[in-house]
């Protein structure tokens, strides 16, 4: 998995940041766009350091591509998104086809995570039709 500064176009990048900021406000910490082979951090809140082991996080979240396939015929319905809860924050991951986004936040409710998920998914789909 490689860090690719040109993986996402500037228009889609701006749309993702806007959609996520609208959904979760100032609790937004970071946004990372990824595919099965590469990733790009498109937003990092100014009070945070860029020294996190992003590659390891992306490798873990990219496992979601396999999860999406594994749950394809679940009696629970289609896989929607993943919300991870940590001591100091939250990770919400959305996968749509061969690309995904995960956002980190200071705090988030289940309702707010659903809202950010819907915002990300609609932005990705709108970006796909604009490509």
Regions found by a protein language model. Give the residues of each.
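Non-catalytic interaction/Regulatory regions outside core domains
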Residues: 1-131
């Amino acid at each position: 998995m490689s860090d690719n500064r040109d993986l996402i176009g500037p228009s889609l990048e701006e749309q993702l940041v806007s959609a996520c900021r609208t959904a979760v406000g100032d609790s937004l910490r970071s946004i990372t766009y990824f595919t099965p082979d590469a990733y790009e951090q498109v937003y990092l809140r100014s009070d945070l350091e860029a020294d996190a082991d992003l590659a390891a996080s992306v490798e873990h979240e990219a496992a979601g591509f396999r999860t999406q396939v594994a749950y394809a015929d679940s009696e629970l319905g289609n896989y929607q998104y993943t919300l991870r809860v940590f001591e100091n924050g939250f990770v919400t991951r959305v996968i749509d086809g061969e690309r995904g986004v995960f956002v980190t936040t200071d705090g988030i409710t289940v309702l707010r995570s659903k809202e950010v998920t819907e915002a990300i998914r609609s932005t990705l789909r709108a970006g796909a039709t604009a490509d």
